[in-house]
Amino acid sequence: MKFQKLGNTDIDVSVVALGTWGLGGGSVWTDGDSTVEDAKHLLDICHEHGVNYIDTAPVYGTGVSEELLGKALKGRRNDFVLQTKCSLNWRNEGGNFHYERDGYTVNNDTRASAVKKDVEDSLRRMGTDYLDSVIVHYVCGSFPVEETVGALENLVREGKIRTYGLSNSQPADLAAYQEAGGNVSVVQEFFSILSPFHGREYFDLCKKYNTVFQTYGVLEEGFLTSPAFMEREFAKTD
């Protein structure tokens, strides 16, 4: 397995990460409910193949993915780089409506108080006293960037998080966070061979700021591994 530094930090991460959307259960996150044993099995496979970068989010099953990971990580927390997210929550404490699912109303809130509470909730659910990386799940233009950056930097100083990043953003957002005094280590965006255009816009900026460009959706939610795609004969000009 190859490794790289996470942005300007001293954190070594594998170039392949485990995304844990599917551990969330419920109506959308996976086909069935996952267990702690499922999570342990995933971590075992990751460790066997040298993958140390684990990505989750509070809204994956409204807390379920984080809780399962927390239990599965007991006794081996230091073997993995743990990344979760902030901004999307179901506390009904303000922010912008994002979606309704499984009986919960999820809002997007990047105010300082919300970011701090998101991180504290994640620490509690996962039973750890620090998070290696926290990503703003959906960048929100309704609240000042300076406020969000200030909250994230405070959490770094407090030792609750080691670094932070952005997702579902625009290149201008990365520049704005940096210009507001931030140090964005990772940008996580949708990118695949079928949908490369949005990601390409980040490459020069990521190089400028030494920010890792992390992709999700690289298999187009399974389409690129489906029989319909794998067995298709493409023309030479396709």
Can you annotate each of these PLM segments?
Residues 79-91:
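A short, structured active-site edge motif that brings together acidic residues
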